[in-house]
């Protein structure tokens, strides 16, 4: 309906391949049926287009989360070779093996029944307040115009928090 080309390249290792670039599959780092990943090689497709594909997936599934993610310096072929079957049969991209985290990593978490326009950060930003999203929060919460400080290193995240608190 949305005009995407969707195939299942390997019925023995079933996942969806969208427009020969984007993989839609289970998240193999969580319990069965909880999260779908929409993974992409960002040198071949803009993140905004991957996000549109992710939003299409989000509208059509009832899992808790759809995670849209991608990285640069990743080929479509390498991404496809990163698809694995877990011991319990779950099939998905092994994200660390896919190299999406290494360069130009972008991610957006799309929760079930959650609209960013009704979340506190967006409401605060619309009322003229400064909003800063630090660490993993900048991945999980979407707020247009927010200051973003990505990071997983605890020391850097704490420095960013203290810096932002000093500027409030």
Can you say where each PLM-predicted feature lies in the sequence?
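His/Asp/Glu-rich, glycine-adjacent segments
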Residues: 1-167
């Amino acid at each position: 309906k949305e005009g995407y080309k969707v195939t299942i390249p390997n019925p023995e290792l079933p996942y969806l391949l969208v427009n020969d670039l984007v993989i839609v599959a289970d998240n193999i780092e969580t319990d069965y049926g909880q999260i779908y990943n929409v993974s992409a090689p960002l040198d071949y497709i803009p993140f905004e287009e991957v996000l549109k594909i992710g939003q299409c997936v989000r509208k059509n599934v009832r899992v808790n989360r759809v995670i849209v993610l991608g990285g640069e310096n990743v080929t479509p072929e390498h991404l496809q070779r990163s698809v694995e079957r877990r011991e319990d049969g779950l099939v998905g991209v092994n994200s660390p093996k896919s190299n999406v985290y290494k360069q130009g990593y972008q991610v957006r978490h799309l929760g079930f029944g959650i609209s960013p326009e009704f979340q506190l950060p967006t409401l605060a930003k619309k009322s003229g307040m400064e909003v800063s999203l630090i660490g993993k929060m900048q991945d999980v919460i979407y707020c247009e115009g927010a200051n973003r400080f990505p990071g997983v290193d605890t020391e850097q995240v704490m420095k960013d928090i203290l810096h932002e608190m000093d500027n409030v």
